[in-house]
Amino acid sequence: MATKLIKHGSKAREQMLEGIDILADAVKVTLGPKGRNVLIEQSFGSPKITKDGVTVAKSIELKDKIRNAGAQLLKSAATKAAEVAGDGTTTATVLARALAREGNKLVAAGYNPMDLKRGMDLAVNAVVEEIKKSSKKINSQEEIAQVGTISSNGDKEIGEKIAKAMEEVGKEGVITVEEAKNFSFDVEVVKGMMFDRGYLSPYFVTNSEKMVAELENPFILLFEKKLSNLQPMLPILEAVVQSQRPLLIIAEDVEGEALATLVVNRLRGGLKVAAVKAPGFGDRRKAMMEDIAILTKGELITEDLGMKLENVSIKSLGTAKRVTISKENTVIVDGNGDKKNIEDRVLQIKSQIAETTSDYDKEKLQERLAKLSGGVAVLKVGGATEVEVKERKDRVEDALAATRAAVE
C-alpha cells in the first residue's frame, strides 16, 4: 500500500499556496485580449503555443506533493469554467488564487473558515446578480462577431467567420472546427442532415472523380436490424425499380449476400442503390434513425412493432431532394418531412436536453437537435506550419465556446 504524506496547519497551507501561485503565475499571463502566449513542451511532436488558460493549467504537474495538491485544486477551478462556459478559464484561475490567498490571511488571523466560506457564497451571489443586471442580449451578427473577436485575442477574421457560421446554421446549429490542408480559413456549410457513416462499398460510387455516390430524389429505406439476405426485400425492390428512382438503404449493417446482390444490381444498372450503416449505437442509433424518418417522411422498419420487410410498401419509404455519400459521411439534403412533425421532434429533444444530467448525453442530444433544426458548419483553420494551425485552432475553439455562451 502506498504511503501517505500528512501535514497540518499553517505550514501545509503555505506550501499549498506556493503550488497555487506557481500555476496561477503561469496562467495569468494569458488573461484578456492583450494576454500573451505560453509555450508548452510536449512529450512528442512540436511544442504547443496557446493562450488558453485551462490548457496551460492542465500541462502543469509539480514534483512536491503538497504544492502539487494546491496546483491541482486551482486547476479544477479552470477545468470547471471550461466545462460550463467554454472560456473565461484564466479569469477563474486568477479569482480562485485571490480567494485562496486572502482566505488564508484571515484564517491565520483567527477567523472561522466556515464563516469565511459562507461570506464568499453571499458575495458570489451578489456579484452574479450585478453582472446579470449589466449584461445585454447578443442578437445581431455584428455583436456575435465582436464577442468572437475579443475571445480570440482580437482576431477579427475569427469573429467574422464564427458569426457567418452561426448565421448559416442558426445559434443551435452544429459548428465544428477542423484543421485545413492549406493556408486559408474558410467556413464550409452543409445544408441538411449529415452523419458520420459512408458507403459500405465503393461500387456504389456514381461520381468517380469525387468518389461520392450522388442520389437524386431517392427513396430512403430505414431498417433497424442487420440485412444479410435480400429475399424479404424483393417486393419493395421491384416497386423501386418500377418507379425508376434511386434507393438509399440505412440499416444497422448490410453484409454478405445482401451487400453482394445490391452491388451486382448497381453495376448492371438495374437499380441505382447505395447502402450505409445507421449512425450511433444502441438506443441512440434507434433515436437517430427515427430523426431521419421524420426528416424524410418515412417509417423506421422495426420488428419491435411487428413490422416486417416483406410487408413494407413504397409509402413507408422516406424521400429527399438529394443524398450525397462519401467514404466517411452521408448528407441528406432537403428531406420531404412534414414541417410540423419536425418541429414537434425538435421540441421533444429540447425537453430531453433540459432533463438530462449527463454532459455526454446533452452533447449528443444537441448534435441531434442541430441536425434536425439547422445544418452543419465546419470552420476549416489553415496556416503555414503545424504549430501555427494548432494555436489558431485553439483560439477558434475558445472563441466559438465564448460566442455560444453569449448567445444562449
Swiss-Prot record:
CC per GO annotation: cytoplasm
Residue spans crossing the bilayer: none
GO terms for biological process, alphabetical: protein refolding
Binding site for ATP: T30, L31, G32, P33, K51, D87, G88, T89, T90, T91
Reaction it catalyzes: ATP + H2O + a folded polypeptide = ADP + phosphate + an unfolded polypeptide
Organism superkingdom: Bacteria
Keyword ATP-binding appears in the UniProt entry: yes
Record-linked SUPFAM superfamilies: GroEL apical domain-like (SSF52029), GroEL equatorial domain-like (SSF48592)
Function: Together with its co-chaperonin GroES, plays an essential role in assisting protein folding. The GroEL-GroES system forms a nano-cage that allows encapsulation of the non-native substrate proteins and provides a physical environment optimized to promote and accelerate protein folding.
Record note on quaternary structure: Forms a cylinder of 14 subunits composed of two heptameric rings stacked back-to-back. Interacts with the co-chaperonin GroES.
Family to which this protein belongs: Belongs to the chaperonin (HSP60) family.
Protein name (database record): Chaperonin GroEL
Species name: Rickettsia rickettsii
Gene: groEL
